[in-house]
Structures are given as structure tokens and as C-alpha cells.
Design a protein with these regions (language model features):
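A glycine-rich, basic-preceded beta-loop-alpha segment at the flavin cofactor/substrate interface
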Residues: 30, 149-160, 168-190
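Short Gly/Pro-enriched turn/cap motifs at secondary-structure boundaries
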Residues: 48, 75, 90-93, 117-120, ...
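A short, Trp-centered hydrophobic/proline-enriched beta-strand micro-motif
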Residues: 78-86
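Internal helix-loop-helix
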Residues: 9-79, 119-126, 137-138
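A short core secondary-structure module
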Residues: 112-156
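Short, small-residue-biased leader/transition segments that mark boundaries at the very start
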Residues: 2-6
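Short Ser/Thr-interspersed hydrophobic loop/turn segments at strand-loop and sheet-helix junctions
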Residues: 11, 34-39, 131, 147-152, ...
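A structural signal for short hydrophobic beta-strand segments in well-ordered beta-sheet cores
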Residues: 100-103
């Protein structure tokens, strides 16, 4: 988390996020240069690319105004770390085959399932989580949610050992009837 402070002071954390949410409002070419220089120096540390260019971009592109206000300023300041939860033990990255379910219960959804090989999993505060809301619809049954990791029922598994990129954690994540409001849906259902 301390590295997020360093990158924020240098203007390199979520720099494509609009200024209205605390970002610099720059284009992706700036990020390409930043990440190219990180790679050139051999820095494989925390998953800044996932945090900045995947999670923040999902929220920026598909989030409601309330979701943007809730998460983007914290992500820019390094106060909230983002992660992308899609890969599952039996499905890999084949989203139409995922088993993590989100079942509607009144104004909420109840999420149960498991993810694996999730970068930033040990540190994340918010997860863009792929779930199945309709198991009969194949890929069209996949719905994304923003899951706050402080919610009851969320649990981090072990930090997985890897051959490389040891500075970036890769984790198992478990969701045991995690209740999220329908307003946590990112984009539309399916």
C-alpha cells in the first residue's frame, strides 16, 4: 500500500481517471509509458496495471455516478486497491463456464462462489467480480458487481506461490453468501 502513496505523489496512480474524481484525466498513452518504464526497470511489484487500467477503467466506463464517487477518488489516492475477480478453478478465464452465482433476494444479490489466481487479492478493497445471474444464458448470463471486501462472507485464501512476479500477490478468494445491494451491479445484468 505504501507504494501507492509514492505513485500518487508522482502522478502515476490511475492517471486516466477524470479530474472530477481526483485523477489527471490523461489518455492511455501516458499509462503505456509508465508501465513500459516499470517493466524496463524490472519492477513487477503490486498489480498497478490491474488497479489503474482494468478496475478503474471498468468503474469509469460502466459505473453509475454513485459508484464512481464511492471508488475512484479512493483508488486515485491509493486508499482503496482494486482487483478483477474472474478466473475460477474449473473454468479458468472462460466466463461462460464460471460457477460463482449471484441470486437476487429482494433489493440485494447474494453471491456465492470461488475465484483463483486473482492479482491484488490479498490487498484489494474492491473487486470487479464476474458472477452468473442466469446459468442458462451462457456468456449472456454473466453479470459484474463491485464487491467491497469488508462485507461479511468474503474471505481471502492463501497467497499463491509463483515462479515470477513475486512482488504481486495472487490469491484465492471465497464468497460465502456475500450480500450486496443491487446498486453494486456494474453495468447491466447479463
Amino acid at each position: 500500500r505504501g507504494l501507492g502513496d509514492v505513485y500518487k505523489r508522482q502522478g502515476m496512480l490511475c492517471c486516466t481517471v477524470p479530474e472530477a474524481y481526483g485523477g489527471l484525466g490523461l489518455d492511455y498513452l501516458f499509462d503505456v509509458v509508465v508501465f513500459e518504464e516499470m517493466a524496463r526497470s524490472g519492477f513487477s511489484g503490486p498489480g498497478f496495471l490491474i488497479h489503474c487500467d482494468l478496475v478503474a477503467t471498468y468503474i469509469k466506463s460502466f459505473g453509475t455516478e454513485a459508484q464512481k464517487q464511492q471508488w475512484l477518488p479512493k483508488m486515485v489516492r491509493g486508499e482503496a486497491i482494486g482487483s478483477l475477480g474472474m478466473t475460477e478453478p474449473h473454468a479458468g478465464s472462460d466466463l461462460k463456464a464460471i460457477r460463482t452465482r449471484a441470486v437476487r433476494d429482494g433489493d440485494d444479490f447474494v453471491i456465492s462462489g470461488q475465484k483463483v489466481f486473482i492479482s491484488n487479492g490479498q490487498l484489494c478493497d474492491v473487486i470487479v467480480l464476474a458472477t452468473k445471474t442466469d446459468s442458462n444464458a451462457g456468456a449472456k448470463g454473466v453479470t459484474l458487481f463491485l464487491v467491497d471486501t469488508s462485507l461479511p462472507g468474503f474471505r481471502r485464501g492463501k497467497n499463491l506461490k509463483k515462479l515470477g512476479m513475486k512482488g504481486q500477490d495472487t490469491s484465492e478468494l471465497f464468497f460465502d453468501e456475500v450480500r450486496v445491494p443491487a446498486s453494486a451491479m456494474l453495468g447491466e445484468e447479463g
